[in-house]
């Protein structure tokens, strides 16, 4: 969710629209429309760009406590639900420290968002060494910079 600035994404979307691509936003496939309905509407192809996959839970004590959430939820609440605003229906809890469990690109995005949200110290907790982290080196570098 942090990989590209919104202005770049908006520019790329405009380029696609100029080529005749129809972009449908605010659509929850399965609730607003089904894939079958899209084909019935005349679409010949459907690309679902839903971002990162479902979160993986570790089934450990404490993972359902207040203040613990998946990176997907955290990033969605910040980017789409404006949870960084105090008047948000579901504001993000502000803390002095945050632990991000995982070593992938989404974990790096969550760590960077936590810093941007004012968290003093962010720890990335990963089961292996830094060299084995699946996050792109560029993502790791940006996370360390922030």
Region annotations inferred by a language model:
Residues 1-146:
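Residues forming the flavin
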């Amino acid at each position: 969710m942090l990989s590209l600035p919104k202005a770049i994404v908006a520019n790329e979307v405009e380029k696609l629209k100029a080529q005749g691509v129809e972009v449908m936003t605010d659509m929850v496939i399965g609730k607003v429309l089904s894939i079958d309905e899209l084909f019935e509407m005349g679409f010949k192809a459907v690309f679902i760009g839903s971002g990162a996959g479902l979160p993986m839970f570790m089934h450990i004590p404490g993972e359902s406590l207040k203040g613990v959430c998946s990176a997907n939820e955290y990033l969605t609440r910040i980017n789409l639900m404006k949870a960084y605003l105090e008047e948000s229906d579901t504001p993000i809890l502000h803390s002095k420290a945050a632990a991000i469990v995982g070593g992938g690109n989404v974990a790096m995005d969550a760590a960077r968002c936590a810093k941007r949200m004012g968290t003093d110290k962010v720890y990335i907790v990963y089961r292996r060494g830094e060299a084995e982290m699946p996050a792109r080196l560029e993502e790791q570098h940006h996370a360390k910079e922030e």
